[in-house]
């Protein structure tokens, strides 16, 4: 059988996973990244069961999770620090979720891609793709391939080049992210190791241990909130909102955030056009309230590679991939998007609502449904 060729656009989580998965299915794969090097932008990341499954499938699991934190629970709390809802994780018969550094994840995926034989091309900007499989580069060159996978992020410039209709919602909220040393602050003994998500007004503060040395803080608020000014956090403002975490917040004084990200929701009319397939934030961006942006990108990449490597014609394979995979991912998107509504409920109403929700197993199940997503066509063969 003649070896098929694929070009992947974008060196992020979804693109690297797709490239590795395709190469392990026998494709000759080039991945193009417009930056001078493939690197992470961000801080920490949550990898749930579904993402761990995908990492295993592309043989990146062991390197990615080395030194990762295994929290016992995710606690949702009010301003007073009282726990309103606790989701237990990583115990027997409980969902798995590891927290790790984003740059470690990217390095593991880069190494897995190289090991699989993927050709990584940096400083390579793709300006257009065509349904016939043409890929056009910034300096006028172009290539024709059997499959194009576009994973160039929420700001994708390539969706329009195949005349693909889509909806894109920029939300009023976003987040700034900062890493601080574990040694910079003290928590009560019973809180150590836990993920803490605290609410006050329209602000959320997410406290996530990532490694034995580092904690990841995410400051979620409206884009015009004076508690964030440029690259810096107004420590006193956030301490007033979350006094029980003031010790940790003092450690952010003078530390620039990695960047501000406005949350977005993207829905494509179709995930493919001709020989071009879209995945990750370019196809199904979601706000990060469930911690599933990376996980859904990776599992969708595995599903795509499995589908197009089957005996089906490409058009049938892409249609089957979308038909089987899209409902689960869009369910995750909707649940995450609905979570934004909590931002604008007064504390006196939100706190009892969250407390009652914590007593109802169906609420936790709906939030964790995405962790059960697994590709169902074929197999890339895991490393564990």
Swiss-Prot record:
Induction: Up-regulated by PQS.
Segments crossing the lipid bilayer: none
SUPFAM superfamilies registered for this protein in UniProt: FAD/NAD(P)-binding domain
Highest taxon in the source lineage: Bacteria
Record keywords, A-Z: Monooxygenase, NAD, Oxidoreductase, Plasmid
UniProt KW Ligase keyword: no
Enzyme Commission number(s): 1.14.13.182
Function as written in the Swiss-Prot or TrEMBL entry: Involved in the degradation of the Pseudomonas aeruginosa quorum sensing signal molecule HHQ (2-heptyl-4-quinolone) to anthranilic acid. Probably catalyzes the hydroxylation of HHQ to PQS (2-heptyl-3-hydroxy-4-quinolone).
Protein family according to the UniProt entry: Belongs to the 3-hydroxybenzoate 6-hydroxylase family.
UniProt protein name: Probable 2-heptyl-3-hydroxy-4(1H)-quinolone synthase AqdB2
Source species: Rhodococcus erythropolis (Arthrobacter picolinophilus)
């Amino acid at each position: 059988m003649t070896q098929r060729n694929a070009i992947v656009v974008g060196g992020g989580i979804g693109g690297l996973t797709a490239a590795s998965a395709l190469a392990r299915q026998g494709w000759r794969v080039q991945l193009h990244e417009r930056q001078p090097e493939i690197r992470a932008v961000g801080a920490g990341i949550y990898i749930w069961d579904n993402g761990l499954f995908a990492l295993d499938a592309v043989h990146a699991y062991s390197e990615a999770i080395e030194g990762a934190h295994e929290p016992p629970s995710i606690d949702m709390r009010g301003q007073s620090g009282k726990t309103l809802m606790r989701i237990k994780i990583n115990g027997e018969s409980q969902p798995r979720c590891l927290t790790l550094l984003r740059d470690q994840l990217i390095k593991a995926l880069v190494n897995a891609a190289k090991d699989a034989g993927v050709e990584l091309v940096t400083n390579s900007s793709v300006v257009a793709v065509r349904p016939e499989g043409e890929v056009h580069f910034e300096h006028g060159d172009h290539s024709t391939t059997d499959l194009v996978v576009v994973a160039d992020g929420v700001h994708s410039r390539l969706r329009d080049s195949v005349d693909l209709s889509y909806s894109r919602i920029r939300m009023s909220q976003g987040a700034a992210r900062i890493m601080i040393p574990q040694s910079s602050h003290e928590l009560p003994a019973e809180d150590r190791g836990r993920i803490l998500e605290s609410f006050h007004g329209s602000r959320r503060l997410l406290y996530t241990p990532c490694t034995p040395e580092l904690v990841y803080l995410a400051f979620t608020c409206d884009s015009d909130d004076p508690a964030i000014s440029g690259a810096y956090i107004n420590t006193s403002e956030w301490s007033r909102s979350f006094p029980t975490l003031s010790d940790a917040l003092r450690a952010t004084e003078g530390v620039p955030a990695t960047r501000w990200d406005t949350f977005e929701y993207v829905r494509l009319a179709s995930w493919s056009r001709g020989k071009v397939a879209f995945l990750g934030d370019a196809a199904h961006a979601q706000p990060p309230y469930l911690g599933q942006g990376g996980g859904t990108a990776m599992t969708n990449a595995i599903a795509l590679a499995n589908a197009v490597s089957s005996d089906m014609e490409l058009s049938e394979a892409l249609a089957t991939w979308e038909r089987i995979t899209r409902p689960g991912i869009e369910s995750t998107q909707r649940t995450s998007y609905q979570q934004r509504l909590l931002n604008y409920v007064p504390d006196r109403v939100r706190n009892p609502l969250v407390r009652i929700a914590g007593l109802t197993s169906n609420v936790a199940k709906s939030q964790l449904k995405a962790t059960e997503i697994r590709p169902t066509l074929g197999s890339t063969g895991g490393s564990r």
